[in-house]
């Protein structure tokens, strides 16, 4: 009897309370970066029935209308009706942003290496905090992501498309998905075992109508037929009713969906959230760099699965550690891959910012449906432009 292994990941829609908060934080970040690319931003958002609180620390020369940014973001998501208990024009907006701590700023603005005489421009910026970050890639999907999180993202994105186009007129913005994939003894995905979808809806929509529409127009439109069989289980709005949703149903906070943002639990996570943070915060920029490295390693054929860990000390430019784990799938020793990575990628914060062009207002688009593995938008850390350099670097190390 072959061994049956299951793995589950989830995603949430742009209308989920925590994702509303993430999108508002990143919309504020983008608005500031559009005027001041050198800004330091840490913007947190809390949403609940009828209210939005924005708080955190910034250092910038920009002036932005936070009230307008918040309302426009909420409207774009789809909260435009008073009956939702949270609507763009009636919500109360309460900003409370203060200047970044001078103690932190002195280590970011001039790294330890620079203070000790290193004149390299890329050694000037220190990491905005200590911490560890992970990046991951696997050859399960064309975008080199784990299949469970890839399908979960596609399901909630499909729900949003059907809602915004009006094809399913009773849908409301809040939704969640969860996909359980069965793997064979070689860790290859063979079928989808279970799909869970909970979607907010107008009160007149019936459970039978929702179930039929979601299975036919969402699940079967997203999941390849080869992965579905008579034993695949569908749980559609299993509570029986989901009219009250969004911030009226649950409060939301920036940074509470870090597993949804990354690899669906398939890879380790350092614990730092992304949204609302400029690229001097290595929680964000180094996580993107680690994904960039892992994806190019797998695309280069140097491994079929790769997890990259980076770690930093606050106010220090160089990472304190770089680790590559290929789970026994690499074509060369992992120490060789680590040496090649250090040759090809400048992993100082300023090096990452330059390499990935991270001073641009590109972040709001990442705040829903995942920061990694996106095929619908052009993100620099998803590009496969380091494959040849890695292959050549491996040869020089060997």
Curated annotation (Swiss-Prot):
A GO term, aspect molecular function: methionine adenosyltransferase activity
Gene3D superfamilies found in the cross-reference section: 3.30.300.10
Positions contributing to ATP binding: 16, 174-176, 241-242, 250, 256-257, 273, 277
Catalytic activity: L-methionine + ATP + H2O = S-adenosyl-L-methionine + phosphate + diphosphate
Binding positions (L-methionine): 57, 100, 250, 281
Needed cofactors: Mg(2+); K(+)
Chief localization: cytoplasm
GO biological process, one term: S-adenosylmethionine biosynthetic process
Involved pathway(s): Amino-acid biosynthesis; S-adenosyl-L-methionine biosynthesis; S-adenosyl-L-methionine from L-methionine: step 1/1
Cofactor: how bound: Binds 2 divalent ions per subunit.
EC number, UniProt record: 2.5.1.6
Residue numbers spanned by region Flexible loop: 100-110
Keywords: ATP-binding, Cytoplasm, Magnesium, Metal-binding, Nucleotide-binding, One-carbon metabolism, Potassium, Transferase
Binding site for Mg(2+): 18
SUPFAM superfamilies, per database record: S-adenosylmethionine synthetase
A Pfam family assignment: S-AdoMet_synt_C
CC per GO annotation: cytoplasm
Family the UniProt entry places it in: Belongs to the AdoMet synthase family.
Primary role: Catalyzes the formation of S-adenosylmethionine (AdoMet) from methionine and ATP. The overall synthetic reaction is composed of two sequential steps, AdoMet formation and the subsequent tripolyphosphate hydrolysis which occurs prior to release of AdoMet from the enzyme.
Subunit architecture: Homotetramer; dimer of dimers.
Database matches in HAMAP family: S_AdoMet_synth1
Protein name: S-adenosylmethionine synthase
């Amino acid at each position: 009897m072959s061994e049956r292994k299951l793995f589950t990941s989830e995603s949430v829609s742009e209308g989920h309370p925590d994702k509303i908060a993430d999108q508002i934080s990143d919309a504020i970040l983008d608005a500031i970066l559009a005027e001041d690319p050198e800004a330091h931003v840490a913007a947190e958002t809390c949403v609940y029935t009828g209210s939005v609180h924005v708080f955190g620390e910034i250092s910038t020369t920009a002036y932005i209308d936070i009230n307008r940014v918040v309302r426009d973001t909420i409207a774009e998501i789809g909260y435009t009706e008073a009956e939702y208990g949270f609507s763009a024009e009636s919500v109360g907006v309460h900003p409370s942003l203060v200047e970044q701590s001078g103690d932190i700023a002195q280590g970011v603005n001039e790294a330890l290496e620079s203070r000790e005489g290193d004149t390299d421009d890329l050694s000037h910026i220190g990491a905005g905090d200590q911490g560890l970050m992970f990046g991951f890639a696997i050859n399960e999907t064309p975008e080199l992501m784990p299949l469970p999180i890839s399908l979960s993202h596609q399901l909630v994105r499909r729900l949003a498309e059907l809602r915004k186009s009006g094809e399913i007129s009773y849908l409301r913005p809040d939704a969640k998905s969860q996909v359980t994939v069965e793997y064979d003894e070689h860790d290859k995905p063979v079928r989808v075992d279970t799909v869970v979808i909970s979607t907010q809806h107008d009160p007149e929509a019936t459970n039978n109508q929702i179930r039929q529409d979601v299975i036919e127009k969402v699940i079967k439109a997203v999941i390849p037929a080869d992965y579905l069989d008579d034993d695949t289980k569908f749980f559609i709005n299993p509570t029986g009713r989901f009219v009250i949703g969004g911030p009226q149903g649950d409060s939301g906070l920036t940074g509470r969906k870090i597993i949804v943002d990354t690899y669906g639990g398939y890879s380790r996570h350092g614990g730092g959230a992304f949204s609302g943070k400029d690229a001097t915060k290595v929680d964000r920029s180094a996580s993107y760099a680690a994904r960039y490295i892992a994806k190019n390693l797998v695309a280069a054929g140097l491994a079929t699965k790769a997890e990259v860990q980076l770690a930093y000390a606050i106010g220090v430019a160089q990472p304190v550690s770089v680790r590559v784990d290929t789970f026994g799938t690499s074509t060369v020793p992992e120490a060789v891959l680590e040496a090649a990575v250090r040759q090809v990628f400048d992993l100082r914060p300023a090096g990452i910012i330059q390499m990935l062009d991270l001073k641009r207002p590109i972040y709001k688009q990442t705040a829903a449906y995942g920061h990694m593995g996106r095929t619908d938008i052009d993100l620099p850390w998803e590009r496969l432009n380091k494959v040849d350099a890695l292959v050549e670097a491996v040869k020089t190390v060997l």
